[in-house]
C-alpha cells in the first residue's frame, strides 16, 4: 500500500509524467551500455573516428630514425608530441604507406611457407567458381563444422609440443614427440624454416592453424566440408544462396571423406564374419588411408558418423552420447524413460517383442537432409515438428519418428510378414524390421495415422498423408516448419562398450549404434584406401578375390608348403581362403574340396607327383568343408565375370596361367607374382622341410625294406635307416640323425643330396 501511495504521489507531479512518457525507454540503457566496462562496444565506429584524427597510431621512438619527418608530398609523418601516458611517438597513417613503399626489404622466401594456409586459400578462391545467386528461404541448422582447411589432425597438446620444438628448440621443458605425424611434421618444418626472420610468435600462430582442427558451431544450409565453410559468408545469407565450387581440395576434407568410406566398408564386412568384433579390429589395424594407419586417424579425427563411431568404440575410444536410428541422430533433450519388454501384434497377427520406452521424452532428430523435434510419451507420439529439403526427406523423417514412437496404429499398419535380414542373413531386431517395412512403403502407415484440424501458427504448416502441405489439416501431431533444428552442440564424449556383434551401448546399457545403422551409400574415396586384410579382398569384386588369393599363396609360399606337408588342416582353415569360397558354386564346393584333399594326400604319400603349380592352383578349393565322394574332376569352376570360368586341374587356363620360362603366374590376365623356385624341382622345398633331422645317404637300398612315405618317417628311431619315397616317385636311403643340433643345415643339403642320389 505504501509503495502505491508513493507512486501516485510521484505521478501527480507533471515533470515525472513528462519524463516517463517522452523519454525513450532505452535512453539510459544506451548511455550505460557505452560508458561502462573496458570492452570496446562499437569497434568499427571507434576505428573510423580514430582514423579521422591526424596521428591515430603510436610507434616505438626508434621509428623517428627510420622514417623521415615528411614524405615526398611534404605531409608530416609523425608528431614531435609524445603519446600521453607512454613513451611512444604519435604517427600518421601516411607513415605506414611510406614504410610499405620505401621501408627495408627482407627475404620473402619464408612467407609462403609460414603463411601457407593463407596462400593456399587465395589459390582455392582464384580457381573456385561462383555461380548465380538464388533468393529463397534458407533452412539453416547449426552444425559443428571444421573452419580451418588444410590442417593436420593433431591434438592441441601434440601440436603444442611440435610448435615448441620447431620455434623454440632450445627452450627447457619436457616435450615428447611420439606419434609418427608429430615427428614427420617437426622434421619438415625445421628444414623449411632455417634462417627464418619472421617473428617466432607469428610462426607459432601460423603453425597452430596448420596443425590443429578448429571447429565452430555454425548455421549451415549447404556443404559442411571446410572448403565450403571458409566461404560461408559468400554463399548463404538469410534469404539467398550463391552457388560455389571450390577451386581445390584439402587433405583434411579428403581424410574425413575417405575415413567414412573405409569405416562403412569395414563394418559391413565385419558384420557378416564369424566374429564381427575381432574381424573389425583386425581390419582397422591393417588398413591405411592415404598412407596413414587408419587407427591413428581414428584416434585423432573427430568425425561423427555411425560406422566411424563403431570403429572408435571397438578401439575403446570415447564417442558422442547421442544414438542413431534410421539414419537420424537422436539426442534426448528432456524427460526420461524406463525400458520394458512387451509383446505386440502386427496387422498380420505376427507377434513382435519390442523394448518399450515408458515415460515422457523429447528428442532432436538430425539427418542429412531433414531435422525434427519429437515429443513422445509411452507408445504415443505427442508432437513432431519436421523441416527438410524436400518432400522425400520430410517423409523419411516422419517414418522414422512414427516407428520410434512405437504407437499401436503404426504396428497395426504392417501388412504381410516381417522377415528382413541383415547382410549375415540374421533376422533384424523388431524395431529395424518395422523401420525397413515402412521405408519400403509407408502408404498404409500414413493413411491409418489419423488427421486433425490445425490452428494457424506462424512458420508452421500441416502435412497430409499423401505428403502435400495444408493450412487446414494435418496428420495427427505432425507439423512442418520452415526452421531447421540445430544439431546437438555439445562435443562431449562418453565411455561406451561394444559387444561381439558390434552393438555399441552407453554405460546405462542403451544401444547407441549397431551395424543396421550403417549407411549403404557407396562412394569413391578421395585418398587411396589400402586394405591389407584378406576380408576386404571382395570389396573390388570376384576378380580381385581370385588374384589376391593366389598372390597371397605365392607371397607366403615358403610357410605354406611346410604347412601343406605337415599340418594341412591348419592350412585349409586359414582365413585367407574364406573370400575364395564365395566364388565356388555352392552345390559342388564340398565335392571339389574332398577331391583336392584326396589328390594332395596322394601327392604326400604315394604317387610322388608333387607339383608346386598344381598345389598353388588347387589349394583354395581345399578350404571348404570336404564331402567324401568318388568323383574325379579335370576342371574346377569359379564364378567370375558374371559366369562360370574353368580352372584346369592339369595345365593352364585363362583363369590360372603359369609361365614356366618366366616363372610368372597370371590370374585372369593380371600378374599374381613370381615363384621363387622352379615347380619341377618344387619337391625340394617340401622335401627339405620334411627331411629336416634326416641325413640322405644315397640311392635306394633294398636291405632296408620297402619305401616309406614321407609321413611314415616320423616313426624311425635315432640312427635308424630307411628307404623313403620322395616327390617325383624316386626312392632314396635316409638315416634319422643322432643329434638335433645340425637339423638346420639339412634343408639346405637335402636338396643337393636328393639330386645326387637320384642321378
UniProtKB/Swiss-Prot annotation:
Domain of life where this protein originates: Viruses
Motif Nuclear localization signal per record, residues: 736-739
Pfam families referenced in this protein's UniProt entry, alphabetically: Flu_PB2_1st (PF20947), Flu_PB2_2nd (PF20948), Flu_PB2_3rd (PF20949), Flu_PB2_4th (PF20950), Flu_PB2_5th (PF00604), Flu_PB2_6th (PF20951), Flu_PB2_7th (PF20952)
Subcellular compartments: Virion; Host nucleus; Host mitochondrion
GO biological process assignments: 7-methylguanosine mRNA capping; cap snatching; DNA-templated transcription; symbiont-mediated suppression of host cytoplasmic pattern recognition receptor signaling pathway via inhibition of MAVS activity; symbiont-mediated suppression of host gene expression; symbiont-mediated suppression of host mRNA transcription via inhibition of RNA polymerase II activity; viral RNA genome replication
GO molecular function: RNA binding; RNA-directed RNA polymerase activity
Self-association state and partner proteins as the record states: Influenza RNA polymerase is composed of three subunits: PB1, PB2 and PA. Interacts (via N-terminus) with PB1 (via C-terminus). Interacts with nucleoprotein NP (via N-terminus). Interacts (via N-terminus) with host MAVS (via N-terminus); this interaction inhibits host innate immune response.
This protein's name: Polymerase basic protein 2
Source organism per UniProt: Influenza A virus (strain A/USA:Albany/12/1951 H1N1)
Gene responsible for this protein: PB2
